[in-house]
């Protein structure tokens, strides 16, 4: 059994957790949303300063909540890519310092790999191979999970990520930031069939459309034109109906691609990860389609859909069990493909 203290500071949450394989011993998340709301989005410099102010307290709280001391911690981990460079540096520097002071193995973890492992925290039976649908503010991808650190990207968005589209539509509807939760809540009061919005498709060079790639920029533009036309006609914009129609279109698009991909590759399990995994419309669509096609669809608990350190610790524990650790010279990267995750590690000596 491996006990890992993990740190996640890739964006606007300062998170520290202690994980014993797939069991969460403690999980501390300090959100910066109230700080960034006044700006309408995350300000990188502000995020970094907030992480600096809260990281030490979060580490102490994680140890206290787990009722553990440093002698009971087997390894230290932190997100190192992708993300905001300044924010990542805060967590990575803290983790490497702790690893040196306490003479513990250190592991850098890919943020998206963490989101894949979020489902492991509640599903003890989940093991590769399976299909992962990663949907967040910065990424939308279909990943063939073959083994720990062994991934193949089968599909992705060609423009806006799903979560990014939610934020942009929320902004044009004047709903505030972050957009995902507020649109989801408002959609409960609206009619998802009120407006026929276009489902973005990605054309293939030889004709036809890509079965797994998605596009959301056209959908976002369609919502903008719809709102502009309603206002031009002097009509009140039915915000709940627009939100519901938009959410349904996104959920239908993601579901169609995930199901097709799983069936084509003979995978009977789809695990969802990322902040948009909390969306009720996506959950409803995927669960219904999974039953129809005799597939298993798994979602993380809501508290582990958004950024957290428990998922980072779970990924680190699995890597450590495979003999992987990271050099203390490891740096941060704003962009790093999930398929390159093994560059973060070297074999245990």
Curated annotation (Swiss-Prot):
Required for the formation of a threonylcarbamoyl group on adenosine at position 37 (t(6)A37) in tRNAs that read codons beginning with adenine. Is involved in the transfer of the threonylcarbamoyl moiety of threonylcarbamoyl-AMP (TC-AMP) to the N6 group of A37, together with TsaE and TsaB. TsaD likely plays a direct catalytic role in this reaction. Fe cation binds at residues 111, 115, 307. Its cofactor is Fe(2+). Belongs to the KAE1 / TsaD family. PANTHER family: TRNA N6-ADENOSINE THREONYLCARBAMOYLTRANSFERASE, TRNA N6-ADENOSINE THREONYLCARBAMOYLTRANSFERASE, MITOCHONDRIAL. Its main location: cytoplasm. Substrate binds at residues 134-138, 167, 180, 184, 279. HAMAP family: TsaD. GO terms for cellular component: cytoplasm. This is tRNA N6-adenosine threonylcarbamoyltransferase. It catalyses: L-threonylcarbamoyladenylate + adenosine(37) in tRNA = N(6)-L-threonylcarbamoyladenosine(37) in tRNA + AMP + H(+). Binds 1 Fe(2+) ion per subunit. Keywords: Acyltransferase, Cytoplasm, Iron, Metal-binding, Transferase, tRNA processing. One of its GO terms (molecular function) is N(6)-L-threonylcarbamoyladenine synthase activity. InterPro entries: ATPase_NBD (IPR043129), Gcp-like_dom (IPR000905), KAE1/TsaD (IPR017861), Peptidase_M22_CS (IPR017860), TsaD (IPR022450). It comes from the Bacteria. GO terms for biological process: tRNA threonylcarbamoyladenosine modification. It holds the Pfam family TsaD. It is an enzyme of class 2 (transferase). It is found in: Cytoplasm. Its EC number is 2.3.1.234.
